[in-house]
Amino acid sequence: MNAYIEEVIAKVKARDSHEPEFIQTVEEVLRSLEPMIEKHPEYQEAGLLERLVEPERVIEFRVPWVDREGKVQVNRGFRVQFNSAIGPYKGGLRFASHVNLSVMKFLGFEQTFKNSLTSLPMGGGKGGSDFDPNGKTDAEIMRFCQSFMTELQRHIGPNVDVPAGDIGVGGREIGFLFGQYKKIRGAYENGVLTGKGLSFGGSLIRPEATGFGAVYYLCEVLKHENDTIEGKEIAISGFGNVSWGVCTKAMQLGAKVITLAGPDGYIYDPDGVCTQEKLDYMLVMRNSGRNKVQDYADKFGVQFFPGQKPWGQKADICMPCAYQNEIRMEEAEKIIANGTKYYIEVANMPTTNEALFHMMKQPGMIVAPSKAVNAGGVAVSGLEMSQNSERLAWSAEEVDEKLVTIMKNIHKNSMEAAAEAGLGYNLVAGANLAGFKKVADAMMAQGIV
């Protein structure tokens, strides 16, 4: 392994030893960059990797709000502005109890390369809070969002930092956040947030974009293997917005999703989530606040496996769509034993490094990384920014056509970067190399800043 890369990883481990998620993503990305680092000794002279792994700015703040009982609650808010070399900081806001600085830094670091892969001018950032919206009333969520934005508004803007939604932050939350921003700033800057409602500057296809984009990327992988999506059975986790997008597009293209999963377990539907009634019910489940996938089993009379993950279920394709590190060695071994050929990461870093590298070594198994696969969400966010800047609204067909093109190019650029480095069809390394190159070129051109 390259000595410079090892030195930077060691420094990160020593300085950020309490941030396991961040260390994990830094190790995975930097180790895959060896071919490019070897070719460019000027990167070490410029301290490029040291600068790359250090956020430009970390903002941490308290978020006080009043609950339904009139009691004051205090949560912690974050915004990690990781890298602005190729554009304003861009990345979602996550409201979930597991949110901490390590998670925010890992997501912001990944976002930097993901945004670069889209070819759109967006830097990397991420934010959120340890506030859990599950079980909260609309009024409580509104008060929290207003308090959160009262501080965040100091640090964002259409040409500075453009947040969006993520886990726990959907259209309702974006609306509350935008309303508070507009109230405080006294200006209608609809480019300050993406994922907005269509009535105030949002884009068609945005809710579906991450799931749709993941399936479009999958289709490019299948095409490379002289295969097709038609008739394929797909196992996924989650049942939220991303999973719904995957189910919808898979059905449209002739495949079927046979599992959904939540905190309570998973369901197996041999007929697939392949009717409009089932897809509509996924939206009902997501908006109910119950967070139970068993509701699907009860309604449609399919099998429910309490407390289990879906990865023991035989499928042609596995697409984890839930949380980071949901796939460990135990799950990876089940996926391999079932003869799954295509492992397509959709959630951010859903696989531990050990499990990821183990699956990548399996003969005939194709592994695709989340930073490429799930880039459709931020790609359409970028297209929303473009529409806001031009004061235009594109049709769903226009947005979808651009999304297809972006996902095709991400696959093509990743494939070519891996081939150029002599790594064959290694989509994991290829995505890291392709995303890194653009950011590195910009950082080198802009001096030591």
Regions found by a protein language model. Give the residues of each.
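Structured beta-strand/loop patches that form or line metal/cofactor-binding pockets in enzymes
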Residues: 42-71
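Glycine/serine-rich phosphate-binding loop and adjoining beta1-alpha1 elements at the start
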Residues: 96, 115-230
